Amino acid sequence: MKFLELNKKRHATKQFTDKPVDPKDVRTAIEIATLAPSAHNSQPWKFVVVREKNVELAKLAYGSNFEQVSSAPVTIALFTDTDLAKRARKIARVGGANNFSEEQLQYFMKNLPAEFARYNEQQVSDYLALNAGLVAMNLVLALTDQGIGSNLILGFDKSKVNEVLEIEDRFRPELLITVGYTDEKLEPSYRLPVDEIIEKR
């Protein structure tokens, strides 16, 4: 599917049918999503595919988001790794000499952790939010490309997600992404004309 067509086809899917979503399709979409760029190639994301605990997770969603999560066959909880130094070292460890030169291994094992050590709390938060947004957009496009609907949800109680899903506290919940099929005819949302958002200097 051409990129323009793919973007025009993607809409927020808020009501789902009972049609199950194949776990292989979800895995494929996540694999494609991780081709997204990330600052320093740090890839600080973690995906939790929720099926069995969807009802419990839905209770943490605010307002109409409760219905969306409750009815979705699958919800993907997107987390980011707040221990950026550990994440950098993991990339070096998992990638190893087969994928990295000695210089690159040094970068992930020592240089990058030293860089992250200089970040204050706000810088870490901004860094994680940016990278989460990049991979989340790739994920919904990858799902759309397979004919699967999705919606990005920000309104939920982030303070309780780790406990409900049994995820280590070092991982920060960013988004819930509901996933499934719909029989609704979805219409595009209004977009500002491009000249309204461009300035030239």
Regions found by a protein language model. Name each.
Residues 1-201:
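Acidic, surface-exposed loops and disordered segments
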